[in-house]
Amino acid sequence: MLPAQYRMTRSTEFGATVSRGTRAAQPDLVLYTLRSDETGEPGPRVGLIVSKAVGNAVVRHRVSRRLRHAARGILERLDSRDRVVIRALPRSRDAGTQRFEQELHTALDRIHARTITARNGAPS
């Protein structure tokens, strides 16, 4: 389970992260990250988007639980100002926690590589 202090709950945070954040797509999910300028709430914040396209309520809740569990594994890699949104794709209904963990780490690696390249002034 993802501790409450790390959960993203405000719609404005979700919207800002998805619209202005860096995106990395994987087969089962899309990861959006944004480094927040605000210092109000400590710790990285993680939000989930699991739409009806994934399946019925039972399937969506199962996917959400697996994603929350997998998200715990990336918390130590995040800065306290990071905001992360994980969007489950329809294919995620068949994915297990280990596959989610692998895809989250891969997506985070891609985003970190992209932001480091952008900071150094090289084209991305």
From Swiss-Prot:
UniProt KW keywords: Endonuclease, Hydrolase, Nuclease, RNA-binding, tRNA processing
GO annotation terms (biological process): tRNA 5'-leader removal
The protein's enzyme class: hydrolase
Function of the molecule: RNaseP catalyzes the removal of the 5'-leader sequence from pre-tRNA to produce the mature 5'-terminus. It can also cleave other RNA substrates such as 4.5S RNA. The protein component plays an auxiliary but essential role in vivo by binding to the 5'-leader sequence and broadening the substrate specificity of the ribozyme.
One matching Pfam family: Ribonuclease_P
Domain of life: Bacteria
Species this chain originates from: Mycolicibacterium gilvum (strain PYR-GCK) (Mycobacterium gilvum (strain PYR-GCK))
Substrates-to-products reaction catalysed: Endonucleolytic cleavage of RNA, removing 5'-extranucleotides from tRNA precursor
EC number(s) on file: 3.1.26.5
Name of the protein described by the UniProt record: Ribonuclease P protein component
Cited PANTHER family: RIBONUCLEASE P PROTEIN COMPONENT
